[in-house]
């Protein structure tokens, strides 16, 4: 058997391997997908991602965040609206990864059935799971979101979004 010359290629398997599906995202990768920046980028990393379906993100809550200066000085609590925004940003990762929607800007179109079940304080790690329920005309959709701390439900609700040009 002769060795292949520099112009010959060794035989390869005709079947190609599908591209690897990314299931986690670092902070740097999130910044390439979402337009938010400090102090309004509220997702530190994505620890689990199922394309077109759901994402699980982490927010490490620290006393250094600017909202704790006034909410509240003697008893810092993460504002509920920021918990909802953090869940929406995790949902944004799901949306920006949908085929033909890469680079789209998604904004709130509505919020339903949001309930806060537990306080979120500095030192907590917020684990947010956001699942895409439906999308219509590739412009409007709804997601179910949950935020937990130490396995305890902190907030939940339905988030509606719209794609703007």
Swiss-Prot record:
Coiled coil: none
Region (Disordered) location: 1-20
EC number, as in UniProt: 4.2.1.59
Biased composition (Polar residues): 1-16
GO terms for MF: (3R)-hydroxyacyl-[acyl-carrier-protein] dehydratase activity
GO annotation terms (biological process): fatty acid biosynthetic process; lipid A biosynthetic process
Pfam families reported in the protein's UniProt record: FabA
Active site as annotated: 71
Gene3D superfamilies tied to this protein: Hotdog Thioesterase
Single GO cellular component term: cytoplasm
Main location as per UniProt: cytoplasm
Catalytic activity: a (3R)-hydroxyacyl-[ACP] = a (2E)-enoyl-[ACP] + H2O
UniProtKB keywords: Cytoplasm, Lipid A biosynthesis, Lipid biosynthesis, Lipid metabolism, Lyase
Highest taxon of the lineage: Bacteria
Location of the protein in the cell: Cytoplasm
Keyword Zinc: no
HAMAP family registered for this protein in UniProt: FabZ
Protein family per UniProt: Belongs to the thioester dehydratase family. FabZ subfamily.
Function: Involved in unsaturated fatty acids biosynthesis. Catalyzes the dehydration of short chain beta-hydroxyacyl-ACPs and long chain saturated and unsaturated beta-hydroxyacyl-ACPs.
Name the record gives this protein: 3-hydroxyacyl-[acyl-carrier-protein] dehydratase FabZ
């Amino acid at each position: 058997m002769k060795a292949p010359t520099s112009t010959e290629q060794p035989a390869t398997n005709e079947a190609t391997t599908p591209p690897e599906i990314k299931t986690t995202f670092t902070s740097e990768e999130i910044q390439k997908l979402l337009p938010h920046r400090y102090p309004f980028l509220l997702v530190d990393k994505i620890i689990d991602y199922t394309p077109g379906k759901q994402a699980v993100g982490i927010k490490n809550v620290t006393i250094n965040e600017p909202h704790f200066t006034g909410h509240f000085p003697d008893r810092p609590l993460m504002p509920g609206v920021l918990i909802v925004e953090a869940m929406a940003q995790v949902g944004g990762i799901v949306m920006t990864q949908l085929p033909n929607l890469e680079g789209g800007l998604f904004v709130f179109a509505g919020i339903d059935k949001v309930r806060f079940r537990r306080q979120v304080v500095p030192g907590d790690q917020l684990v947010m799971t956001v699942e895409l329920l439906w999308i219509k005309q590739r412009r409007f959709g709804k997601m179910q979101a949950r935020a937990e701390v130490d396995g305890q439900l902190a907030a939940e609700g339905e988030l509606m979004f719209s794609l703007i040009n």
